[in-house]
Structure formats: C-alpha cells, structure tokens
Amino acid sequence: MAAILASASVSTMKTLWETKIQKIQENHNNQRRKPRSRLVAADVWEERHTLARLRDKVKMQDGRLLLCLEQEDWKALPGCLVRLSQVQEWHIHRTGLQKIPSFISLFSNLLVLDLSRNGVTEIPKEIGSLTQLRELLLSYNKVRFVPEELGDCESLERLELAINRELDRLPDKLSQLRRLVRVDLSMNAFGTIPPCLLRMPALEWLDMGGNRLRSLPQDIYRMQKLRALWLQRNLLETVPESVGRMSRLDTLVLSGNRLSDIPPVMEKMDNLRFVNFRDNPLTLEMAAAVDEEEREMFGREFMLTYIQEARKRALDEAN
C-alpha cells in the first residue's frame, strides 16, 4: 500500500512539474510574440497611414479618377497602392521615383501613366497588361531599355520618352501599336530612326531632335500619315529624295544639322507649310531674313528660293 502511495505521489509531482514547465514555456513564447505583434501592429498602422496619404492625392477630373503626386518623396510606390486600382490616371512628377512597380498590371483601367521628371530606370514587362493605356509619358527619366511587351498596349496613342539620354533603340514589336499618333524621342542616343516607327500606320507626329542621327532611311516615306517631323540638332548631312513622297507632311524641322543642300524634290511638297534649315552649312549663301521671327515665318519661301537659285546656278555652270 505504501508503495502504491509513493508511486502516486511521484506521478503527481511529475505532472505538476510538467504543467509548470509548460506554463513557463508558454509565458516565454508569449513574451517572444509580443514584439512581433507590436511590429505587425506598427506595419498595419503604417500601411493605413500611407494609404490615407495616397487617398488624399486622388481627385476626380472630367469624370476620371486621378492620382497626383508632385514634389514629394516617393522613391518607391507601396504595395497598398493596389487598393486604389480604380484610379485611371497616374500623374507622379518630381518624386525621385526609381521604379515602376510590377503590380502596375493590376491597374487594368489605367488610361494615362505620366511619370515624367523622376529617376525611373526601366519599364517593367508587366506594362503589356495595360491594354486600355492611351498615354505613356516618361520624359526626363533614366530609361535605357524599352521592353517588347509595350507592343501589347494596343490602345496607346501617345508615347513620350524624351530626355532619357542613353536610350538608343526600340523593339520591333512596337510596330503593333496601330493607334499610336504621337512619339517624342528627343534628346536621346538614337543613331537612326527605329524601323518600328516606319510601320506605325497612325503616326502623325515624331520628334527625334537632339539625337545622333547621321542619315535617314530611304523608305522614310512609309510614314504616310506623318504631319510633323522634328529632326533638329542631329548629324544629318543629306535628306533622301524619298522625303518628297511624304504627301501629308506640313512641318519639317532640320535646323542644326550638317546639310549642304536642299533636295529639289522638296519643291513639290505642296502641303509643307513650315520648314526650318537654320544653322546648316548650306552651299549657297542666301540673304538673311530681317529677324528670327521673319526667318521662321518664311522658312518655306527660303527653301523654294534656295532650290530655284541652285537650279539656276547649275544651268549657268553647264553653259
């Protein structure tokens, strides 16, 4: 009987100790969880605070929801921004933004993505999910590469990549952009007009001023709907005669190149209303206009006079 009691007493003591140890362990675990809980709570509070800040920057304009951030510190956009996926336009300027988040693909209703004047270095391939996007504005950034997925943005009408400095090519797939009307690639490092631009059926306005163009493609006339072509401050020495087949062209800016002559075929470009050959080493010396305003206004007259004078001198030399 004593042995049984002793055994029961040992068993009871063992159970008590095990229970005590378990409670100590639970208390220890609870103490470890508390800092984590505090961190989680802090994260939740920070996310709510950030989301509230972003919501304050959303406004309605012309029936659209716009997110507008100007001169604030947003080097990276927080994940909580996806809670505002109904926004149709982003206008984020001078924030130091360095990266377009991959979750941009969740903004399926986005019409305008304007991230001008930031520090964006690349365009994510997820951009191709934005099939409703009409305007992509990334001028004054540091973009060096354009992904071919941009060619999937079938609604794109306006593309601005000016002053990215080192950008020097576009993927061929961009020729799929059947609605693209306006392209600004000025102040970059292009050595030639990207072939994809020649196959964009709706293109009307192209600025490639301030690049490194040394020549123009012979099939430049394929841009049949082009109305304005800006090629100022390049390294062009000649203009191909095929430019005469660009029947809708009404503005042609060639100032600040290395042109020595004007193609006679341009005399027949009846739609050409504004043309600028200023600051080129043209072979013939023509009388200067009274002032800059007059010179700009009579650019076409200067061109016609130059061509006629060149023809006359050629005949005189032949005789």
Where are these regions (language model features)?
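A contiguous binding-surface segment within folded domains or other stable secondary-structure elements
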Residues: 215, 226-251
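The feature captures the LRR N-terminal capping module
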Residues: 1-196, 200-218, 227-228, 241, ...
